[in-house]
């Protein structure tokens, strides 16, 4: 079953349900939500915009197990995205943001087709996964746990990569790379940056990849 809902504009997404969300940036289109799910799931959903945040969650005391839950949405801009649990967020097409911040709590997934911004800050706590394509001047990647950040196709000038645990980061850096690993995490990088600073405590590894 499908429902399309008109909503206010927003620049942040908070995903707290096991949904697959497809976001597009349209500066000249009215924001909307289009929800595809089982008919009995709609009444348990609480989808709203508050304080420029699109919040996607369930109503109090609701526990959903949909056979499918797919959400399509757009806004004029996006600056922040948070995924809690096992949700998936895809930024479709080209997305331009001044500064972009993303966070995954749990086993969720974020994928960006073409994200262009000045700075990007990404943090994963748990076993989540983030895959990035695009470019930025500066990136800050952090993992606590066993998560992964795949950014071999995300070009940055300067990057700060930190892992606590067994996570994995792949980065494409041209100028400066600062790495801090505590545990058995791995950082692989491309781009031949002339300045690479490493601090490793444990069995972590740093590898330059051609």
What are the residue ranges of the model-derived segments?
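Intrinsically disordered, low-complexity terminal regions
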Residues: 1-210
